[in-house]
Amino acid sequence: DGKLDYDRLTGFTAEGEAELAAQMGPVGAEGSVAVPDLVADTATYLGYLKGEGLNVSGVVDLAKYYTIETETVDVDKLLSDVFFLIVPEENVEGRTYLTRTSSGGFDLNRDNSFQTQAETQNMTQLIAAWNPVSFTEFHGRVKQFQCEPCDPPHEPNFEYDLLAEHLMAGGEALGIAAVANNDGYNSYVIPQRDYLSYTGAKAADGADQTCWYDPWDDMSTSYTPQYAMLHGTVAYTVEVPAYNDDVAAAVAYGQLGQSAYIAENKQEYLLAQTKIFERGVTNANSDAYELVGQWFCDQYDVEGAEAELFRPEYDGAGQNGNFYPECYIIPLDGANQSNLQAAADMMEWLSRNDVKILVSETAFSYSGVRYPAGTMVVSLYQAKRSVANGALYDGTVITGWPVLYSEGITAFAKTRGFDMVTCAEPAAYRTIRAACGDWMDHADCVRYLANVTSSFTGVEGAKVILSNASEDSTAAVNALLQAGKGVGMILSGEQAGSFLCDYSDWRSVCTQYRLSGAGVAEADAPLSLTITKAPVVYISGKPSDSRTGFVKTSLVSGSYQYNYDRQAMELLGFQVTDDASLATLVIGAAALDEAGLAAVENGAAYIGYGSNAISAITGYTDRRGNQIPGCLLSTGSLVRETVSSESMDALAYVTYPTQSLITASYVSEGDELLYGYGAGYFSAIPEGAQVLIRLDGAREPLEGFLVGGGEHYDDFLDNSIQAISYQKDGLNLALFANTLTNKLHQRDEFNFISNMAFSSLLGGVY
């Protein structure tokens, strides 16, 4: 008859209230569950109670503890109130082959901000186009049956106070219906509701102190629901407890209950999302405590305690006093933009994510620089300002929390390596806006980018200095070398680390890639050495085929580091081999394997980065307590430390104390920033090693998660060694304490790998 019935928990019985108090524990007692002030008025705790003796979701005597009503949903009316976008499976190949990862070897639920994979590009574009008021994604497995909203810390680009109007109630609507309509899993948890604990101590004001000991946070927008929240969407990840018929019923009824709640409150949902967009269009300041500010609590749940950390305001002379600037200026001309490829890619990324783009039609000046017509301007006066700012802002350095679920890095200008200027002065923005044309959507930007091509200045018909600044520049050099063309690497001067080629060869690649070139007469060409041949790269850590089931399961499932490296090499245009004996360069974030080790010992150059690669060299203790010896270097000569076991990453200023072609292009470009996942450094290096990179202890990092109480926190920040080179006993090594290819996002670090590849083929060490 077009109607669906489901049971809904509506309240607690007397026994239920007593059991709730017992399971939450005495107020103020160490380990008891505390009710967060910010959700005390919206959280009902219906569905919280676990079965006797259980700490996971299981069977509960619902009738004993809850009052229950049967709700009837008229499906036709529901569909007249709301419509549904249903994506049965984002990861089609993963579903086919029973792997969490995609065929590319990526966890797609860590790629929604970076959007390096086709699957996430498609999903995020769908969200951006439809602007759903609510989004729910089902995952597994968390045996407690977990439904969001997340606990803090929260991503600062969320307009969280408006999202919070329905986050808790919508999450509970799903959880309540799910657990009340299946036979096996009758309780669920919500991080924001259930994960705050009493410490047993008193706060300074005499109140019982509380603490988020193990946050399930939404600081990272790499997860699909958290990405959706940037679009004003009330969004959830649901972590089911198992894969079986009971859970299938729970998911179906959970969605029904949540859908009924959304239909009942659809005008309020639409109004809240409209207010989010209104804040964007007016670039309103929503930092106040009573708005977003209160949601930036510290680890001890003091509301607003970290508002200034998470939402610092532009408070200089003439600036807007807002967390959001007025606009970002991204040049698209060769004089002002060192990385044309990444800048053009950013225009496509932003517009694909429903950020509207402006392009100047006349020249304008800002902060003493004249920008020509054709300069990209990303205005924050638009509905999707949170999406734009979430991608382009520098980020937050978090030190006061014990753990995060994933790194929060975006900072595209820094991690992808293009030049960008931030404007926070309203008066200057008005001048910039007046120079621009109409707003451009994705289709407009794609058409426009067809005419954003390589930049060339100077003498034609002689030599060309090809700037070493991007994946495209590396791929172009590889294309020339693989075609048998001569390419030199510049050894010194302002262009050290860039390339020298013939003008005719430049012409053969400048239309295929977005490059920057400067023509010079042969007599004026800078000193260079010819790269003797095209590099051949061996990537350490490729697993053998699986013996049963899908033969590539071992490759695509769990071999994250290998797949990051593999896709990075594809972007850079390197020839990759599975026969290490043919390699001129061995690379890897994974541990150096047997074949790679043999190649390095026989003369191939090696660049290793991150904890696994370095541990294979230094030696380590395995899970069983066995001491595994290192390789290449003598025991104890290289020591890698980390800030703490839970620390993750840093985008930090660095110095380059040693002249080397491995770092030369960064020095020439004035690139003083290094991103690395791992929060590591070298506390001891082998005799004869050269320090390539140190952290700049005089400057604060821009972004990162570094536990302030970590054993080596101060050591890490105190000019710590981040990278070394070592040429001795026939070895040619470059070793980095942290990652260079993590999740394919940190592309500004790719050139360390390519510089090693090319410089090792110059006939000496440079």
Predicted features, each with a name:
Residues 1-83, 157-219, 224-766:
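Intrinsic-disorder/low-complexity accessory segments
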Residues 21, 49, 108-121:
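Aromatic/His-enriched, Gly/Pro-containing loop or helix-boundary segments
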Residues 83-89:
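Extended hydrophobic secondary-structure segments that form protein cores and membrane-embedded regions
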Residues 86, 108, 123, 136, ...:
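Divalent metal-coordination and catalytic microenvironments
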Residues 91-93:
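Active-site neighborhood of divalent metal-dependent phosphoester/pyrophosphate hydrolases
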Residues 96-102, 120, 139, 145-151, ...:
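Short, solvent-exposed loop/turn and secondary-structure capping segments
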Residues 105:
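Acidic/histidine-rich helix-loop elements
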Residues 115-120, 124-185:
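Active-site-proximal loop/hinge segments that shape catalytic or ion-binding/gating pockets
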